Amino acid sequence: MFSDFKAKADLERTGYKIKEKDLSLPEHEQISDQTYDDIRTFVKLSYSHEETVKALILTPVIVYVINQLNGKYSILYEVYIEADDDLKGRCDIIVSKVEDDDTNDTLGDKPLLVTEAKKKTVEEALSQCGAELIALHKLGKKAQYGVISTGDDWMFLEIFPEQQIVYQHHRKLYLSDLRRVANIMLNVLKV
C-alpha cells in the first residue's frame, strides 16, 4: 500500500531512488492577481484535519489553476490504483486533462499527482508520493510531477523513469510562496 512508503529506503525497494536537486519547474505563465487573492481567502481559514486541508486549501488552488487553462480537466479524489502487489493504494488527488470524448472521472494521460501529507511534514510523504508516481508510470500514464502539501508547506517531485529516480525539489515552498505554487501547477498541467 502507498501508505506503507514512509522512508526513502521503502521506495528504494522498487528500484528507484529519491534524490534532491534544483528542479527546473515550469513557471513561465503567471496566475492573475485576482486569482491569487481569491486563493488566499481560503488559506486564511483555520484548518487542522486532513479533509479540511483538502477542501479549503488544496481544492481551491487546483480549481483556480484549472480555470486559467483552456480545456477540460478532471479532479479525482481518493483514486485507487494498482500497478503491482507493492505499488497500490489510494492517491489523494489526481488532476488531469480530459479528452473531449472522455468523462470527468477519466484519468488522463499526463496527470498531476497531489498528495496531502498526513503527518504534518511534506518530507514524511516523499516516499509515498514517489511510489504513487512510479505506479502511474507502470500503468502507462506519463505523470511527470507530484506535489505534496500540508496546506502550509509544499514540495514538488519529478520522476525520471529511465533513470529510476524521483527528484525532490531542493527547496520546500510555503504559504508565502502560494503564487509560485499555483504558477508551477498551472504550467505543469498546461504541458
Locations of regions flagged by a protein language model:
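Loop/turn residues immediately N-terminal
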Residues: D152-W154
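Central hydrophobic cores of alpha-helical transmembrane segments
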Residues: I148-T150
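A short, conserved, highly charged catalytic patch centered on acidic carboxylates
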Residues: M1-A143, F156-V191
